Amino acid sequence: MSFRIAVLISGEGSNLQALIDGLGDAPVEIVGVGSSRADSRGLERAEAAGLETAVFSLADEPDRDKRDGALADWLDQRDVELVVLAGFMELLTPGFIRRFAGRIVNIHPALLPSFAGLRAVAQTLEYGVKVAGVTVHFVDEGMDSGPIILQEAFGLPYHRGIEAMGEGEIDAIEERFHEVEHRLLPRAVRLIAAGRVSIDPDDSRQVRVESDG
């Protein structure tokens, strides 16, 4: 029996595509793709893969609690076991997070707890760190503050301050982040679906991850 996931997006949907392509023969089914924007390129990717889509936009429903309530109902109707935030660029309400406690994961382009929030790649470059990376974590009610599942680091070459960098330099570094994201997120979902990920009952900050070989 397949492990049922839904993917929430806002923009290009490259991490959604990585899930579509990277889950392979894993017993995981993407049962729905929800977007916060009607013009998300990710919706086209989902439809091309034959996936069900829906839009939950604050432009249509400005009350965030009502919007998130409708989204939660939509997920429950599809018996979703895991909600994957793959470039979903909005904070979810505490009520939504409590409703799916321990069943929401997010991918973030930084080694948390450093550089949480928006513009994580820009923050990384502006600070001048020598090692960057990507984090997959459970979602709690804070800003990118939930328990960490997986992280992957990589070295950054010397670069000038972001204001002085050329577009090509920035694009090359952003592509490195994307490469890691597109590998790490499907791996995390596979591990969760296989029951290899668990939060320590005695210390909720600690996540046990069994090797995937």
Question: How would you name each of these model-derived features?
Answer:
Residues 1-41, 45:
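N-terminal Rossmann-like dinucleotide-binding module
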Residues 11, 33, 46, 83, ...:
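A residue-level signal for conserved active-site and pocket-lining positions in enzyme catalytic cores
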Residues 22, 28, 36, 86-208:
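Donor/substrate-binding cores of folate-linked one-carbon enzymes
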Residues 46-47, 75, 97, 124:
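A generic structural signal for well-ordered alpha-helical segments
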Residues 52, 81, 130:
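Residue-level detector of anion-binding/catalytic polar loops
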Residues 54-59, 107:
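Short beta->alpha connector loops at strand-helix junctions that form conserved
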Residues 59-72:
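Glycine-rich, highly charged phosphate/nucleotide-binding loops
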Residues 74-81:
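Glycine-rich phosphate-binding loop signature in dinucleotide/nucleotide-binding domains
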